Amino acid sequence: MIQSDKGADPPDKKDMKLSTATNPQNGLSQILRLVLQELSLFYGRDVNGVCLLYDLLHSPWLQALLKIYDCLQEFKEKKLVPATPHAQVLSYEVVELLRETPTSPEIQELRQMLQAPHFKALLSAHDTIAQKDFEPLLPPLPDNIPESEEAMRIVCLVKNQQPLGATIKRHEMTGDILVARIIHGGLAERSGLLYAGDKLVEVNGVSVEGLDPEQVIHILAMSRGTIMFKVVPVSDPPVNSQQMVYVRAMTEYWPQEDPDIPCMDAGLPFQKGDILQIVDQNDALWWQARKISDPATCAGLVPSNHLLKRKQREFWWSQPYQPHTCLKSTLSISMEEEDDMKIDEKCVEADEETFESEELSEDKEEFVGYGQKFFIAGFRRSMRLCRRKSHLSPLHASVCCTGSCYSAVGAPYEEVVRYQRRPSDKYRLIVLMGPSGVGVNELRRQLIEFNPSHFQSAVPHTTRTKKSYEMNGREYHYVSKETFENLIYSHRMLEYGEYKGHLYGTSVDAVQTVLVEGKICVMDLEPQDIQGVRTHELKPYVIFIKPSNMRCMKQSRKNAKVITDYYVDMKFKDEDLQEMENLAQRMETQFGQFFDHVIVNDSLHDACAQLLSAIQKAQEEPQWVPATWISSDTESQ
């Protein structure tokens, strides 16, 4: 970068003159001179960019460019013409004459100079320029070319261990073998010599007339090194003028299981949550995409948004009818399964170490919270228990039914962009998620206790009566049932449920209160509530807490206990741990596309360190977020 000293003295008058052989009538140089003269009046003053611009115009490399420009302009204005366009022939004639002349040192030196290779090359270049012989002369076309004969093009490609990057098909009417598509990033696309629609005539000297596409593919597969194609070029080559788009896969796709894919080998498999770069959307049914995790490879075929949504819809309607399917999530269980799933339906939170094993009665626990040095909101037994039962609430079901049904056949791709939080922006909401007993609540507690001035939970809402030692806005926001239900119907409640006849929940406004204070809001959610949180105003970063293997879970939870409606201090059983692992797999299978980060809770200390690191990256490093979040922010400004 060119820098200048603002305190420097103005340049001398002689320095303002450009050191070039510039013609005064030259427009560009004259303008630059005038600019330098004007800038010299402001040089050294506190004017942004003046010194930098002056130094730029006065730099040696720009002066050298101006010299070259002036020389070219001078040559152009003189309109010089060569003395002869046949200087090389004239040189040969001079050499022949010198041979007949009596020998002398001068004549011998002249003869050696004219016969020197460099001088001959100089004269050859002179004659080429003088004769304007810049392109090779093609032989004239013969007069007896049949009008019906198509123009041919010979294409040679050197194939190493890389795929050719093209697919072929047979024309239904003519039976010709055509190039169906050119895969982005493949050998054929990089060469720029083959286009979709080109007709193959020969491959390595073998005519493809009458062959099936599979036979042509076999010829290509057996070829090594150089592959020679003889093709009839398409009259109007397709041009991909579309802008590249990045999407998050909201479903999974396996080309090997799709009978409709045009070329299985060219298919690109992906899983939920993968970020794809869509490089070609010219085909209405099959797009070309690549994973950003592997940008070096060529693109592959994926179903278009319309086609994949249609496949999802066909699969959805082909399933056996299940009444009230929209009310169920992967966490829901039938009444017959209730006794076998204590850890899921009846458990409050069974976390590591001694947190849950020292669980007090509800009244005593809340009173202890009042006497703490700092108060942590949102850790009430009733709040956690009602959240586990929220899917049984008729109110919850009536509001969420439509969204749940829609999400089952929702958009298979979600357009995303890179988002970098600016220092002036509010922090992103941190959402923790995981099966019961994995340690979500304890991780959140330790995170807030680690730095309560930086991390905070949102204060929940409740319809129960405030107790004598409680304060409105500290333990809970105490509201009427009518107010609570209005918040639900206006979609201002992120989560809610009912416990002992009272409603509990966390509102958007409660989260915003924490964010406006310049703190990071940390909350834990059930997976079925995640859609309501994914808004542009909160920009949540979802972290999934995953249990470790059975051996590690037995060791870390040997002293932990499960708190249920029916038992107190019930030890973890192997079936409880197995159910926790199974539940985590189901959550990851159904909701994994919403997870921004996954932490395996092998030990509470390591998991907490990983959580801190993940939160820091979420707030400070670029992340993929839905494009609607950014467009909504732009419209609101």
UniProtKB/Swiss-Prot annotation:
GO cellular component: actin cytoskeleton; adherens junction; cytosol; plasma membrane; protein-containing complex
Region (Disordered): 1-22
PDZ domain mapped to chain residues: 154-235
Domain L27: 24-80, 87-137
Tissues showing expression: Expressed in the retina (at protein level). Highly expressed in the retina. Lower amounts are detected in brain, testis, ARPE-19, RPE/choroid and fetal eye. Isoform 5 is retina-specific.
Main subcellular location: cytoplasm
Coiled coil: 568-621
Cellular compartments annotated: Cytoplasm
Domain spans labelled SH3: 242-312
First and last residue of the signal peptide: none
Record field: compositional bias (Basic and acidic residues): 1-17
GO biological-process terms attached to the record: protein localization to synapse
Protein keywords: Coiled coil, Cytoplasm, Repeat, SH3 domain
Domain Guanylate kinase-like, chain residue ranges per copy: 427-616
Record function comment: May play a role in retinal photoreceptors development.
Family listed: Belongs to the MAGUK family.
Cited PANTHER family: MEMBRANE-ASSOCIATED GUANYLATE KINASE MAGUK
Subunit: Interacts with MPDZ. May interact with GRIA2. Forms a complex with CRB1 and PALS1. Interacts with FASLG.
Protein name, entry field: MAGUK p55 subfamily member 4
